Curated annotation (Swiss-Prot):
Enzyme class: transferase
Pfam families: Pkinase
Residue numbers carrying Phosphoserine: 9, 272, 328
Subunit text: Heterodimer with p38-alpha/MAPK14; this heterodimer forms a stable complex: molecules are positioned 'face to face' so that the ATP-binding sites of both kinases are at the heterodimer interface. Interacts with PHC2. Interacts with HSF1.
Limits of the Protein kinase domain: 64-325
Post-translational events: Sumoylation inhibits the protein kinase activity. Phosphorylated and activated by MAP kinase p38-alpha/MAPK14 at Thr-222, Ser-272 and Thr-334.
Motif extent (Bipartite nuclear localization signal 2): 385-389
Protein name as annotated: MAP kinase-activated protein kinase 2
Lineage, opening ranks: Eukaryota, Metazoa, Chordata, Craniata, Vertebrata
Location(s), subcellular: Cytoplasm; Nucleus
Length: 400
């Protein structure tokens, strides 16, 4: 039974992220003869949602909660609920209240202004089975998963232009996240859902269970990374987290263009040692007939997303500025094999999804292990030389 939290304290706000500072506009004594060229744009200026108010009253005051399961997130079931006043349908996700759950809700709330990210409507703090829980009310996405929609389209050909438009939609979600210093880190087929079954439905990114804030914390002293030395301004942990999303874009784009994944397990395991090796070594191909009509430019775009070295992967800005994405209306309407292959391999699709889930989990673990060493532990030869000299001077001073 759901009930309101103990006490009737006012709603608890999440702090709203500060807007990025705007550079002052210099005053011009005379208008220039020609307007100056615009500065190169790294990210569009996005509006970030203001602070989230967590409601303390019982959710059943406002919504009718049903037992209809809409889906399974990494942290539990998503249920169908109805607004009692408007009868509008929504999705309810329940998280046991803890700092990690609050971070997930906060990051998702910040991002839910984006048209290609599932929108949070309300958040409640209620007791459920004697435990304090966060109840997240989200818009209901009725259109099903991205690849199920392509599987179910019958004889209608799926084209390269459609693949480009889909990748642009997913890219817009990632661009929004990266621009406000959030890495999703779990971009995969089952987290990409359509708003409805209609042809004009919008594709949206869901499930922020692994999302992470990526604000860089540069130190005055140069840290050392394992397994190699590099300055923090060149490589911060945030580069790894964001590169995880770019790798996902590469895998999804590959599947969209042919119907099967670039990496696969030979032995029916969720992720076999061989598959891990192929991912780490970047071993994949563009075999015919599925790839025969796909341009070399598009294959190169995939190669730049699936680079084995995370820091060499394309950034989201580079991806969104690529002609295949930016000018998606000009992409040829070449019929692809995707729909046929997805239908033929339908029984294998759950394995494909499981493999990608495992690959992303492995990647997150690998990147978490790249920790900054303390300055005392650093093996920087210059620091070692300076320390040796300091110790020699200290010893000389003590001797006198």
């Amino acid at each position: 039974m759901l009930s309101n939290s103990q006490g009737q304290s006012p709603p608890v706000p999440f702090p709203a992220p500060a807007p990025p500072p705007q550079p002052p506009t210099p005053a011009l004594p005379h208008p220039p003869a020609q307007p100056p060229p615009p500065p190169p744009q790294q990210f569009p200026q996005f509006h970030v949602k203001s602070g989230l108010q967590i409601k303390k009253n019982a959710i059943i005051d406002d919504y009718k909660v049903t037992s209809q399961v809409l889906g399974l997130g990494i942290n539990g079931k998503v249920l169908q609920i109805f607004n009692k006043r408007t009868q509008e349908k929504f999705a309810l996700k329940m998280l046991q209240d803890c700092p990690k759950a609050r971070r997930e809700v906060e990051l998702h709330w910040r991002a839910s202004q984006c048209p290609h990210i599932v929108r949070i409507v309300d958040v409640y703090e209620n007791l459920y089975a004697g435990r304090k829980c966060l109840l997240i009310v989200m818009e209901c996405l009725d259109g099903g998963e991205l690849f199920s929609r392509i599987q179910d389209r019958g004889d209608q050909a799926f084209t390269e232009r459609e693949a480009s438009e889909i990748m642009k939609s997913i890219g817009e979600a990632i661009q929004y996240l990266h621009s406000i210093n959030i890495a999703h880190r779990d971009v995969k087929p089952e987290n990409l859902l359509y708003t409805s079954k209609r042809p004009n439905a919008i594709l949206k990114l869901t499930d922020f269970g692994f999302a992470k804030e990526t604000t860089s914390h540069n130190s005055l002293t140069t840290p050392c990374y394992t397994p190699y030395y590099v300055a923090p301004e060149v490589l911060g942990p945030e580069k790894y987290d964001k590169s995880c999303d770019m790798w996902s874009l590469g895998v999804i784009m590959y599947i969209l263009l042919c119907g099967y994944p670039p990496f696969y397990s030979n032995h029916g395991l969720a992720i076999s040692p061989g598959m891990k090796t192929r991912i780490r070594m970047g071993q994949y191909e563009f075999p015919n007939p599925e790839w025969s009509e796909v341009s070399e430019e598009v294959k190169m775009l995939i190669r730049n997303l699936l680079k084995t070295e995370p820091t060499q992967r394309m950034t989201i800005t580079e991806f969104m500025n690529h002609p295949w994405i930016m000018q998606s209306t000009k992409v040829p309407q070449t019929p692809l094999h995707t729909s046929r292959v997805l239908k033929e391999d339908k029984e294998r699709w759950e394995d494909v999804k499981e493999e990608m889930t495992s690959a992303l989990a492995t990647m997150r673990v690998d990147y978490e292990q790249i920790k900054i060493k303390k300055i005392e532990d650093a093996s920087n030869p210059l620091l070692l030389k300076r320390r040796k000299k300091a110790r020699a001077l200290e010893a000389a001073a003590l001797a006198h």
